[in-house]
Design a protein with these regions (language model features):
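Non-catalytic, surface beta->alpha helical segment in thiol-disulfide oxidoreductase systems
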Residues: 74, 79-109
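A short glycine-leucine-enriched loop at secondary-structure breakpoints
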Residues: 68-73
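Acidic phosphotransfer microenvironment of two-component signaling modules
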Residues: 1-3, 63-64, 97
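Short pre-active-site segment immediately N-terminal to redox-active cysteine/selenocysteine motifs
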Residues: 19-22, 27-30, 74
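Thiol-based oxidoreductase modules, predominantly thioredoxin-like and allied folds used
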Residues: 26, 38-45, 49-64
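Conserved hydrophobic/aromatic "anchor" residues
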Residues: 2, 26-27, 81
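A short beta-strand-turn-helix
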Residues: 1-22
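Cys/His/Pro-rich metal-binding microdomains
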Residues: 32-35, 79
């Protein structure tokens, strides 16, 4: 899944494997702001379909990925990864305008 499609962790440094830029949403089922943002993320995934890939990672199910690899400390956390593998991180609930701005700035520029 994620390891073979998005990141390769086999070497010394993680390597981005995605064909397109992506947004990774680190969330928890018990996180209120995460649940409130979920419908917006679905809409944006459709809006940017074919240009930006979206992934949702449940931090409780993917403890190693969330905690050890990306060191996610608060939810929701969004990682915007461009085609070169550069990562921009945003933590906390944000509105659609901010999310779109981040996608346009960090994923599509």
């Amino acid at each position: 899944g994620f390891n073979s499609k998005v990141m390769d962790f086999s070497g010394d440094m993680p390597k981005f494997l995605g064909a397109r830029p992506c947004v990774i949403d680190f969330y928890a089922t018990w996180c209120g702001p995460c649940q409130r943002m979920a419908p917006m993320i679905e809409i944006l995934a459709q809006k940017y379909g074919g240009k930006v890939d979206f992934y949702r990672v449940d931090v409780d199910k993917e403890k190693e990925l969330a905690g050890d690899v990306f060191v996610i400390e608060a939810m929701p956390t969004f990682l915007n990864i461009d085609k070169s593998g550069a990562i921009n991180s945003t933590t906390g609930a944000i509105n659609a305008k901010e999310m779109i701005s981040n996608i346009e700035k960090f994923c599509l520029d």
